[in-house]
């Protein structure tokens, strides 16, 4: 049996839309990261960008399990001494850009490497139910039905 190694020209990229309403952030991000890398395909090749384009809608309606909504803290550093900043998940989700919670979760599940920025460029996250990618005819992926733990009660 011969091992298949995809060439960039042979990759068939699909468009997938995921409705994130009521889904658990970490479980959603794990599935999205797998789709972006292309690991759901039989002909996955690590050094080729063979993943799909993923659109996540209703990113402002994601859920956290336990008390993470109030207690989870996101850190970033300004680059200056003593410049560590922190924001809670609640602060971000109730702010102007709630989709950043999903973006950061997916970004941190992808491996840093030569393809990182290219793969991350195939992710589109929107806070409402509207998206401007109808022309690509994305297929709907029901993440909630894949596992009952994906949906928060």
From Swiss-Prot:
Ribosomal protein in keyword set: yes
The protein's assembly and partners: Part of the 50S ribosomal subunit.
Entry protein name: Large ribosomal subunit protein uL13
Organism, as annotated: Methylorubrum populi (strain ATCC BAA-705 / NCIMB 13946 / BJ001)
GO terms, biological process: negative regulation of translation; translation
GO MF annotation: an example: mRNA binding
Family under the similarity heading: Belongs to the universal ribosomal protein uL13 family.
CC terms in the record's Gene Ontology section: cytosolic large ribosomal subunit
PANTHER family: LARGE RIBOSOMAL SUBUNIT PROTEIN UL13M, RIBOSOMAL PROTEIN L13
Keyword annotations from UniProtKB, A to Z: Ribonucleoprotein, Ribosomal protein
One Pfam family named in its UniProt record: Ribosomal_L13
Primary role: This protein is one of the early assembly proteins of the 50S ribosomal subunit, although it is not seen to bind rRNA by itself. It is important during the early stages of 50S assembly.
């Amino acid at each position: 049996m011969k091992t298949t190694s995809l060439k960039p020209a042979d990759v068939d990229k699909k468009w997938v839309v995921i409705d994130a309403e009521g889904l658990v952030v970490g479980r959603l991000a794990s599935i999205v990261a797998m789709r972006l890398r292309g690991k759901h395909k039989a002909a996955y090749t690590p050094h080729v960008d063979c993943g799909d384009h993923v659109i996540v809608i209703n990113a402002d309606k994601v859920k956290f399990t336990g008390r993470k909504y109030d207690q989870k803290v996101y850190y970033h550093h300004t680059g200056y001494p003593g410049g560590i900043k922190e924001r809670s998940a609640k602060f971000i989700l109730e702010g102007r850009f709630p989709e950043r919670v999903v973006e950061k979760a997916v970004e941190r599940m992808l491996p840093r490497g030569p393809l990182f920025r290219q793969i991350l460029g195939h992710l589109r996250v929107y806070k409402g139910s509207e998206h401007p990618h109808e022309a690509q005819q994305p297929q709907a992926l029901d993440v909630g039905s894949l596992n009952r733990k994906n949906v928060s009660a």
